Every structure is written in C-alpha cells, then in structure tokens.
C-alpha cells in the first residue's frame, strides 16, 4: 500500500525528476563543448537558445524530435514562463547559453524564478572564450613568478558596470 502511494506521488511530481539544465555552449566550436554539455543536448526534449549567439553545429546535437525555441527576439520575462511550462509538462529542458554559464549569462535571474516555482536546476559550465584564446595561442594564463592574477571584466554598454568595478 505504501509503495502504491509512493508511486502515485512520484507520478504526480514527475516533472521534479528533470531539472531545467543551463548549458554553456563554450566559445563557438562544437568540439569545444564539454562531454556533459553534449550529453544534455542529446537528451533534450526542449532546447531554448539565443540563435544569434550559438552556432548551428551545437544545436544540431539535439534530437530531431526536440522542440527548438529561438530566444534572440524574446525578453527574459518571456523566456522564463517557457522554461517553467515545458519542465512542468515533464520535458527535459535545456537552456543553452553562449560561452560559460558563470560569466555574463543572466542565469541568476532565471534560476531565481525557477527556484520560486519549485523547479530544480542543473548548471553545466562551458569553456570560456578567454580559455579558448589562451589555448589558441598555445599559452597559459598563470605562470609562477610572472603572473598569478586574472581579472575578467567588460566594458559598459547595455548592461552597466558598477562604479566600484570600473577599471
């Protein structure tokens, strides 16, 4: 009897089994995706990505039957309900971001909204452009006795830079 109740409870909460997965696409080349990123793309039922920033070779890893939602013309306020809706329908949802999810990706706002909706998340990092640039130059970014500090920043633009962080 307990087993049946447990089964029904897990059936009614089936959507909790699939977190919304935020995946970093890396610097652009599909062969620079992490193995986990490629795996999540291959398992996706729904893929949301900014089509102006992610190359087609990467999105092509998603199954043919995957629902593909281009988000370059959508606001974050329009994307978040799509994430929630598709995940609650039981889909494996992948939100693909260019670069690395830890840098300039706006995943914080999305994760907060998903947390508020009691939806689990998974974050799969991507290779950052600065890492790919160093590899392309056959170089490393830290050298003992020479440099041990890396500062990442960006110029102000649409997204303002706090005065305390101006270089």
Model-derived features: where do they sit?
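Short, well-ordered secondary-structure micro-motifs
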Residues: 106, 134-136, 162-165
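A generic local secondary-structure boundary/capping motif
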Residues: 10-12, 37-38, 138-142, 164-167
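Acidic/glycine-enriched edge-of-secondary-structure segments
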Residues: 65-75, 143-154
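Structured adenosyl-cofactor binding patch, chiefly the S-adenosyl-L-methionine
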Residues: 129-141
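Acidic/polar active-site rim loop that often engages polyanionic ligands
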Residues: 113-115, 145, 167
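A polyampholytic, Gly/Pro-enriched intrinsically disordered region
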Residues: 90-97, 140-152
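Active-site glycine-rich loop that binds ribose-phosphate moieties when present
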Residues: 153-167
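Class I S-adenosyl-L-methionine
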Residues: 1-127, 131-132
């Amino acid at each position: 009897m307990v087993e049946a109740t447990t089964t029904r409870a897990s059936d009614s909460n089936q959507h909790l089994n699939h977190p919304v997965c935020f995946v970093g696409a890396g610097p652009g080349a599909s062969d620079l995706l992490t193995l986990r990123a490629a795996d999540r793309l291959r398992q996706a039922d729904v893929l949301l990505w900014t089509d102006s920033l992610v190359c087609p070779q990467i999105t092509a890893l998603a199954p043919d039957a995957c629902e593909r939602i281009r988000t370059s013309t959508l606001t974050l306020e329009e994307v978040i309900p799509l994430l929630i809706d598709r995940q609650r329908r039981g889909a494996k949802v992948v939100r693909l971001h260019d670069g690395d999810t830890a840098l300039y990706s706006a995943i914080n706002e999305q994760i907060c909204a998903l947390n508020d909706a009691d939806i689990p998340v998974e974050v799969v990092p991507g290779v950052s452009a600065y890492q790919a640039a160093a590899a392309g130059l056959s170089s490393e970014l830290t050298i003992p006795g020479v440099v041990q500090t890396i500062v990442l920043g960006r110029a102000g633009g649409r997204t303002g830079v706090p005065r305390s962080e101006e270089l």
